[in-house]
């Protein structure tokens, strides 16, 4: 192949392998449009910032979890604003009833999932269904709840 042909080959979009889109902090995802303006909003923003989580993403997560209800408890035992599961609470050593700790450790746990899976979309799936489910299915698990959760928070 001569130099000109090689250059044409390198520049040909058709011949280049597809590039996977990997969501990053800079990826376009919907901004937070919730109506909540209470005392936990700035606490959640600060927790996201300290843990390297996109602020709007974390605000949408908290909104989706229990609508900013600090006393919320799910039927599965998840607690507080960030709906931390009992096992996660034990792992992180936090008081889930303290809204600031709950948000801080929710953001920290989400960041840990991002570091594990390399994608905010998969981090959200792991936050909802558990990291084992994301590993088992090598992506967002086929659970309706988890798929809806990721779609609502991530936006697609």
Q: Where in this protein do the model-derived segments appear?
A:
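Cell-wall glycan-active module
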Residues: 1-60, 156
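Extracytoplasmic
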Residues: 53-56, 76-79, 118
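Secretory-pathway/luminal and periplasmic proteins that interact with or process carbohydrate-rich
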Residues: 67-73, 131-137
């Amino acid at each position: 192949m001569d130099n000109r042909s090689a250059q044409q080959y390198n520049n040909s979009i058709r011949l280049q392998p597809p590039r996977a889109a990997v969501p990053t902090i800079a990826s376009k995802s919907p901004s937070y449009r919730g109506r909540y303006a209470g005392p936990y909003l700035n606490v959640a923003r600060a927790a996201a910032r300290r843990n390297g989580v996109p602020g709007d993403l974390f605000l949408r997560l908290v909104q989706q979890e229990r609508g900013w209800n600090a006393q919320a408890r799910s039927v599965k035992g998840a607690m507080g604003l960030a709906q931390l599961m009992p096992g996660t609470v034990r792992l992180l050593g936090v008081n889930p009833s303290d809204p600031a700790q709950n948000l801080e450790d929710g953001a920290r746990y989400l960041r840990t999932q991002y570091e594990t899976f390399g994608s905010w979309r998969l981090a959200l799936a792991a936050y909802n269904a558990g990291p084992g489910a994301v590993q088992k299915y090598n992506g967002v698990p086929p659970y309706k709840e988890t798929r809806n959760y990721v779609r609502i928070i991530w936006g697609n």
